[in-house]
């Protein structure tokens, strides 16, 4: 049996586990039906079609609060190793402003060193409030997901709103839907919100 990592099976297992924990076995079985054969080798059409139907079932069977809890728990996670220094500094000082500045500095270095952004594009990105750290106002942090990093330059220069939407989405499971006239329930996109939730829960070491 191949031990190669299968992103699709891993995501589905996480989704099923969250459904079990938050809604119970019966709803989990109903929402997950039809997913048994999906793998990373499945066509995007099959993955997207199943995801649309699963979200429709989830929207019918589960209230909004629990839907958000389920989907945010399915998110891809920021590497904990890259948050260690920030977490330790916050544990020592309790200074949220300092933790936020450290995360922002880390994000700007990523833009420059990993993506090769010049100062002007970094400034434009920060001005829009995009990225890991977000904008801190009092005790609230408003984080707006950056367009998919490989397309950020194209996103900024593009004027067609439909093409901009295609550039924006990060999700490898369903982003191809944006090239079609089809839609998926907004419930699904809470998965992306969980990315930021996970960052701050790791730094603060408590639920947010």
Model-assigned labels for residue ranges:
Residues 194-203:
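Amphipathic alpha-helical segments that form well-ordered structural scaffolds
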Residues 1-184:
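N-terminal accessory segment detector
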Residues 204-208:
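Low-complexity, intrinsically disordered Gly/Pro/Thr-rich segments
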Residues 185-194:
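Short, thiol/selenol-centered motifs that function as redox-active sites or metal-ligating centers
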């Amino acid at each position: 049996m191949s031990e190669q990592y299968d992103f699709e099976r891993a995501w589905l297992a996480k989704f099923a586990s969250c459904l079990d924990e938050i809604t119970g076995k019966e709803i989990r079985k109903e929402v997950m039906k039809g997913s048994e054969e999906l793998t990373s080798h499945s066509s995007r059409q099959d993955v997207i079609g199943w995801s649309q139907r699963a979200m429709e079932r989830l929207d019918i069977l589960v209230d909004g609060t629990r839907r958000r809890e389920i989907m945010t728990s399915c998110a891809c996670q920021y590497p904990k190793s890259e948050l260690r220094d920030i977490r330790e500094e916050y544990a020592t000082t309790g200074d949220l402003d300092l933790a936020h500045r450290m995360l922002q500095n880390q994000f700007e270095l990523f833009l420059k060193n990993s993506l090769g952004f010049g100062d002007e594009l970094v400034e434009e990105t920060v001005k829009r409030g995009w990225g890991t750290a977000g904008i801190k106002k009092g005790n609230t942090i408003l984080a707006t997901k950056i367009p998919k990093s490989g397309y950020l330059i194209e996103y900024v220069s593009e004027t067609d709103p439909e093409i901009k939407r295609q550039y924006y989405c990060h999700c490898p499971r369903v982003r191809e839907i944006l090239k079609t006239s089809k839609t998926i329930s907004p419930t699904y996109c809470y998965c992306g919100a969980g990315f930021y939730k996970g960052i701050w829960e790791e730094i603060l070491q408590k639920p947010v």
